[in-house]
């Protein structure tokens, strides 16, 4: 019997709710079978579009959603009772889901019919994406509230998507992906169990609603074996740790986006082949096949994909699902000695690392003591070193670099660009929204939200009330900040200089030593991340490399204002300021830093 195809998505959203809605309708008309919403950084980090930290970030890497009016526009003409919607949202996941539910209630749609997923994995935010806001304990409380609320009110909703995807994007090895992601899942489920609001049978069903979001890299056999190991280990953990009896509730359910870290700016047309090969690893093995797949576009190393670029990735999925005979056969790898041995070894190694994390107190302790972050920073450094040394071949980057001019990028930059007016228009619309809403309703809703946050009352009902009253993203988050506080995650950077035999590094180190001797002190290098971009692995690797070259490095983590960076540079008397900005806001933010420096 032929299997049904996986859910086919493209990760999309930019500029405004209106433009993103047009993009969604266009993609759905081409055969996409689910939505995957990308939010801009202010929305992800809980700021309204007019906040100082939102400057330059509005609409850049996703769609800005400040209130229920924006959500109405975003999902206009999209039937919520028929759509499977994935939202890549974490610290503010409870709020964005509340807006979604409030819109469904407004349209008289039965909550039982809402299908979708909120990513809602805050532990990996501390480790990779950097959109966390609150400390671990209250963050896990918010996740627990969402899990128990959706179990009772939205039975078809996946409240948490445990993400190993982002761990691979910052350098995790396959065994680290397995162990870190499973430790994260256990941390969330343990918190739900401790809340003691569900019966044993209800908790077993909650376990069955946990889903995962994984990565698939270019090492095809290893990645496929990793997925089979995930299936076995999750069955093992849910059975032995939680006593889940029903095999359906022990099933490893996952969606995937294939690797973006390996997409290259050089010869970007080669990325099409990388994307296809990486996808094969998660769809060929029937017993470990993804339930949903979204593919990056070939040009994501260059910038924001255009509609045509997204269509190309969509067609790739459709050809594999509908033209090939892949879905007509049982698992192709059952009985393979090579596969079985590889899977078993990965399970042994992953259990060892998982148990090590549990012995230190679990994933949250591993965040707080920086163990998990340091492991990822070190793994990523090893990966980069292998590429720099030529041990790991990347076609077009360190081998086969000669190329003809690509017709795909010959006539323009080959990417979508965001109109600079978007931010001003969004701020103007936000001010109009505030002016025209019923402030009495807003004040009442915020008061109830504060009461819920300060008590053990589930946060979701008060959040839905706030959404219906017209509360904004920034206002909801400010309540949580006031009650829970904020958290700056460890950077994972150490000043331990590691010996290298790379000639380029050794040459730079000689020059650093010579200049330092001449000036009477070590070259001091401040690495700053202004704005809201939390993808810190680039900055971390620059910090590690600069330290290895003999510089004194100052790196204070993510989400700094231009004024804070300039203040630190003066107080620390640095020689060099380096900036890492991956959200497309570099021109504006660099300009602001230069202006601040001139004032001093």
Residue map of PLM features:
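Short beta-alpha connecting loops at secondary-structure transitions
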Residues: 55-60, 85, 124-133, 167-171, ...
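Mobile "lid/hinge" segments at catalytic clefts and subdomain interfaces of large enzymes
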Residues: 121-124, 139-196, 273-354, 360, ...
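Glycine-rich anion/phosphate-binding loop at the beta-strand->alpha-helix junction
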Residues: 182-185, 213-215, 220-305, 309-313
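Conserved, mostly hydrophobic/aromatic
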Residues: 31, 67, 108, 234, ...
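Short acidic (Asp/Glu) and glycine-rich catalytic loops that position anionic groups and cofactors
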Residues: 3, 50-54, 80, 124-126, ...
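Catalytic alpha/beta active-site cores
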Residues: 1-223, 241, 248-257, 289-296, ...
């Amino acid at each position: 019997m032929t299997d049904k195809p996986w859910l086919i998505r493209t990760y999309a959203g930019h500029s405004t709710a209106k433009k993103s809605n047009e993009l969604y309708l266009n993609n759905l008309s081409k055969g996409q079978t689910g939505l995957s919403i990308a939010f801009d950084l202010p929305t992800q980090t809980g700021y309204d579009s007019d906040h100082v930290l939102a400057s330059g970030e509005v609409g850049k890497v996703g769609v800005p959603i400040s209130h229920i009016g924006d959500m109405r526009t975003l999902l206009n003409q999209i039937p919520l009772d028929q759509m499977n919607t994935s939202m890549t949202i974490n610290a503010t996941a409870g709020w964005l889901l509340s807006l979604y539910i409030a819109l469904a209630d407004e349209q008289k749609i039965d909550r039982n019919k809402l299908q979708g997923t909120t990513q809602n994995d805050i532990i990996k935010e501390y480790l990779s994406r950097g959109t966390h806001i609150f400390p671990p304990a209250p963050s896990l409380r918010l996740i627990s509230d969402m899990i128990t609320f959706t179990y009772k009110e939205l039975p078809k909703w996946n409240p948490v998507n445990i993400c190993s995807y982002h761990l691979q994007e910052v350098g995790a090895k396959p065994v680290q992906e397995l162990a870190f992601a499973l430790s994260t899942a256990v941390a969330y489920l343990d918190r739900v169990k401790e809340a003691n609001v569900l019966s044993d049978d209800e908790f077993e069903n909650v376990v069955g609603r946990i889903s995962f979001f994984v990565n698939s890299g270019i090492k095809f056999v290893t990645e496929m074996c990793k997925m089979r190991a995930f299936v076995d280990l999750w069955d093992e953990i849910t059975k032995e740790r939680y006593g889940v009896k029903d095999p359906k509730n022990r099933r490893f359910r996952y969606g995937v986006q294939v690797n973006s870290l390996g997409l290259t700016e050089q010869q970007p047309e080669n990325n099409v082949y990388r994307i296809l090969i990486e996808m094969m690893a998660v769809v060929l093995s029937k017993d470990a096949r993804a339930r949903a797949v979204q593919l990056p576009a070939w040009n994501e190393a260059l910038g924001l994909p255009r509609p045509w670029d997204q269509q190309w990735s969509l067609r790739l999925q459709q050809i594999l699902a509908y033209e090939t005979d892949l879905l007509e056969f049982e698992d192709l790898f059952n009985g393979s000695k090579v596969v079985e041995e590889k899977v078993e070894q990965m399970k042994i190694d992953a259990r060892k690392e998982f148990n090590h994390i549990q012995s230190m107190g679990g994933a949250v302790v591993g965040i707080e003591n920086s163990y998990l972050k340091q492991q990822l920073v070190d793994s990523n450094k090893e990966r980069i070193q292998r590429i720099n040394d030529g041990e790991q071949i990347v076609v077009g980057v360190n081998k086969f670099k000669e190329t003809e001019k690509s017709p795909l990028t010959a006539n323009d930059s080959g990417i979508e660009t965001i109109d600079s007016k978007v931010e001003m228009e969004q701020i103007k619309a936000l001010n109009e929204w505030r002016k025209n809403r019923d402030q009495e309703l807003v004040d009442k809703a915020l008061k109830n939200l504060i009461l819920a946050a300060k008590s053990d009352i589930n946060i979701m009902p008060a959040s839905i009330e706030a959404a219906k009253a017209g509360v904004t993203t920034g206002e909801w988050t400010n309540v949580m900040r006031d009650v829970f506080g904020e958290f700056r995650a460890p950077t994972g950077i150490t000043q331990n200089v590691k010996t290298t035999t790379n000639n380029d590094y050794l040459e730079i180190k000689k020059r650093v030593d010579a200049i330092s001797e001449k000036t009477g002190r070590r070259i001091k290098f401040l690495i700053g991340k202004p704005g809201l971009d939390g993808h810190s692995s680039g900055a971390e690797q620059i910090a590690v490399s600069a330290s290895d070259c003999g510089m004194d490095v100052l790196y204070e983590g993510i989400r700094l204002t231009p004024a804070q960076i300039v203040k630190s540079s003066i107080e620390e008397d640095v020689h060099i300021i380096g900036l890492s900005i991956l959200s497309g806001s570099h021109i504006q933010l660099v300009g602001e830093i230069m202006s601040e420096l001139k004032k001093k």
